[in-house]
UniProtKB/Swiss-Prot annotation:
Any Gene Ontology biological process: aerobic electron transport chain
Protein's UniProt name: High-potential iron-sulfur protein
Main localization of the protein described in the UniProt heading: periplasm
Protein family (similarity comment): Belongs to the high-potential iron-sulfur protein (HiPIP) family.
Species assigned in the record: Marichromatium purpuratum (Chromatium purpuratum)
Length: 82
């Protein structure tokens, strides 16, 4: 886990219901439109920055200066175009 990874106790993460592992998130109860809940994760979200950081950790527009796990999910998940 990178030192600058978003923690689930981070105030912004709590507000957005971010979980590092989408399977342990509220994505089924709070599913967003675009894909079935089980297919919603940070890797296919429009807020994820695909050009940043390591393989499993990327930047996110919602958590400036921090990294999210591609297997994560938050309540702002929005399907990336394309």
């Amino acid at each position: 886990v990178p030192a600058n990874a978003v923690t689930e106790s981070d105030p912004a993460a709590v507000a957005l219901k971010y979980h590092r592992d989408a399977a342990s998130s509220e994505r089924v109860a709070a599913a967003r439109p675009g894909l079935p809940p089980e297919e919603q994760h940070c890797e296919n979200c429009q807020f994820m920055n695909p050009d940043s950081a390591a393989a499993d950790w990327k930047g996110c527009q919602l958590f400036p200066g921090k990294l999210i796990n591609l297997s994560g999910w938050c309540a702002s998940w929005t399907l990336r175009a394309g």
